[in-house]
Amino acid sequence: MPFITARDGAQLYWRDFGQGAPILFLNGLGCSSQMWDYQIAAFADQGFRCIGFDRRGHGRSDQPAGGYDLDTFTDDVATLIDELGLASLTLVTHSMGGGEAVRYLTRHGSERVSRLILLAPTTPMLLKSDDNPGGAPRAGFEALWAQWRRDYPKWVADNIAPFFIPE
């Protein structure tokens, strides 16, 4: 199985199908790259190179104790793009993957990315502020972040059902 090594030593899983112009699929929170199986098969059959990536704490990637912040996630994406030598890349994203892609572009530039597709992306601002009075209070985010730092894989396991299992 193909893995890359992140800057902090975490082993991050990726899958590669087809040949041609590259498409990198970034999944939503709590999902693995397998969520893209149907899309990967269809695009690979149409002559594209399709790469699925399991972010840290997801799928077959390591579940390290730390590194569950947006900058680390996007640095992991940058490591994958660099290691695979990807250029003229199309990023296809879902939910949190959209936030990763936008942060990637602001941190690492757009030289290697030619297209960005955002599917049901996370909103750019969830925190309550003067500019976003309908947002959530900071205390809620701080409690969530503390849980993530303590044991992100456990948080995902405990909270994934509402996303996929109807009541």
Please place each PLM-identified region on the residue numbering.
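Helix-loop "lid/cap" segments that line or gate small-molecule binding pockets
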Residues: 143-147, 157-167
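Conserved alpha/beta-hydrolase "nucleophile elbow" surrounding the catalytic nucleophile
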Residues: 27-29, 89, 93-95
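Short beta-strand immediately N-terminal to the catalytic nucleophile in serine-hydrolase-like folds
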Residues: 73, 91-93, 119
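Catalytic nucleophile serine of serine hydrolases
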Residues: 54, 61, 95-96, 120
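Conserved HGGG/HGGXW glycine-rich cap/lid loop of the alpha/beta-hydrolase fold
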Residues: 6-66, 80
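Conserved acidic catalytic loop of the alpha/beta-hydrolase fold
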Residues: 71-89
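Flexible "cap/lid" loop of the alpha/beta hydrolase fold
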Residues: 99-150
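Residue in the alpha/beta-hydrolase core beta-strand immediately N-terminal to the catalytic nucleophile
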Residues: 54, 90, 114-117
